[in-house]
C-alpha cells in the first residue's frame, strides 16, 4: 500500500500520506522508514477533512476509492471517494498541479470535458499491452488542447488533443530513435480496402492498448508511413516494415475472403 506515494515522494522535501483506513496507515508507517522515506508523514483521516486545513503545497496526488459502501467496484468519477469533480477548485487553490488516478474503463474524452478545461495532461498507461491506469494532470488556467501521453512499457507516444499537426506529435522508444517520417495521405477508401492490393501493402499493424484507448489513429497516419484500412477499423497497413511502430506488426503473406472453400485452401497444412 502507498506504492505510488513512495515513488513520487522521493522528489519532494516533505510528503504527506492521507488514508482513512487505519490498518493501511499502520502498514504505511511501518513501510515508509524501511523504504528510506523518513520525510513522509502519515495521517489517518478523511482526505476532504485534511484538505480543508491544508496549506499551499507543490502537488496533490489523489487515488480515489473505486468501491462503494457495499464493496462493489465503481467507475464514474462522481461515484468514487472523494469526488474529484466537486473538489476540483479547492484542490487547485491548494496546489498548482493535481494528479488524479482513475479507472482505465472511463471515457477519457468525456472525463476531460467534465473537468471543463482544468485537465492539462492525460496519461494512458499500459503494461504488457494491457491498459492499467488513466492519469489526469490538472492545472490552473483553462487548457483547450491537453497533452495526451500513451505509454505501453518502453513505447511512448504523445500528442496534443484536438491538434493533429505533426509538430505537436512525438514518438519515443527506448530501443529505437524517433522516426522523422511524416505521411499525410488519406486512409484507404472503402473501395480500395475491398479490393486490397497485396502486391503493394506488405505489412499489417495493430496499435498498442494505450493508443487504442486514446483513439489517436490519425496521429499514427501522420507520424508513420501507415494507412488506415477503414474509418471503422483499428488496423493499418504499410508497404515497408516499421521497426518502431507502437504496437504489433505482421507480414502479409496471403489474403482471402471469408469464403469457406477459399479459406480451406489458404489454411491447408497449418496446424
Language-model segments: residues:
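SAM-dependent transferase fold signal centered on methyltransferase-like domains
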Residues: 1-271
Amino acid at each position: 500500500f502507498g506504492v505510488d506515494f513512495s515513488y513520487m515522494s522521493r522528489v519532494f522535501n516533505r510528503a504527506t500520506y492521507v488514508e482513512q483506513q487505519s490498518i493501511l496507515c499502520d502498514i504505511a508507517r511501518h513501510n515508509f522508514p524501511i523504504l528510506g522515506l523518513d520525510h513522509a508523514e502519515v495521517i489517518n483521516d478523511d482526505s476532504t477533512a485534511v484538505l480543508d486545513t491544508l496549506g499551499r503545497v507543490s502537488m496533490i496526488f489523489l487515488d480515489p476509492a473505486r468501491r462503494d459502501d457495499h464493496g462493489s467496484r465503481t467507475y464514474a468519477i462522481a461515484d468514487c471517494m472523494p469526488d474529484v469533480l466537486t473538489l476540483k477548485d479547492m484542490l487547485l487553490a491548494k496546489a498548482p498541479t493535481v494528479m488524479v488516478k482513475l479507472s482505465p474503463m472511463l471515457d477519457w474524452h468525456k472525463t476531460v470535458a467534465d473537468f471543463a478545461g482544468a485537465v492539462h495532461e492525460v496519461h494512458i498507461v499500459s503494461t504488457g499491452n494491457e491498459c492499467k491506469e488513466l492519469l489526469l494532470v490538472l492545472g490552473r488556467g483553462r487548457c483547450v488542447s491537453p497533452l495526451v501521453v500513451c505509454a505501453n512499457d518502453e513505447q511512448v507516444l504523445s500528442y496534443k488533443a484536438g491538434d493533429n499537426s505533426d509538430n505537436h506529435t512525438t514518438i519515443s522508444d527506448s530501443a529505437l530513435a524517433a522516426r522523422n517520417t511524416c505521411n499525410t495521405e488519406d486512409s484507404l477508401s472503402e473501395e480500395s480496402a475491398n479490393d486490397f492490393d497485396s502486391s503493394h501493402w506488405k505489412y499489417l499493424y495493430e496499435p498498442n492498448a494505450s493508443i487504442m484507448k486514446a483513439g489517436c489513429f490519425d496521429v499514427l497516419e501522420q507520424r508513420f508511413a501507415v494507412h488506415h484500412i477503414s474509418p471503422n477499423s483499428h488496423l493499418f497497413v504499410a508497404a515497408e516494415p516499421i521497426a518502431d511502430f507502437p504496437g504489433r506488426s505482421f507480414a502479409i503473406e496471403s489474403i482471402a475472403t471469408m469464403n469457406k472453400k477459399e479459406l480451406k485452401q489458404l489454411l491447408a497444412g497449418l496446424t
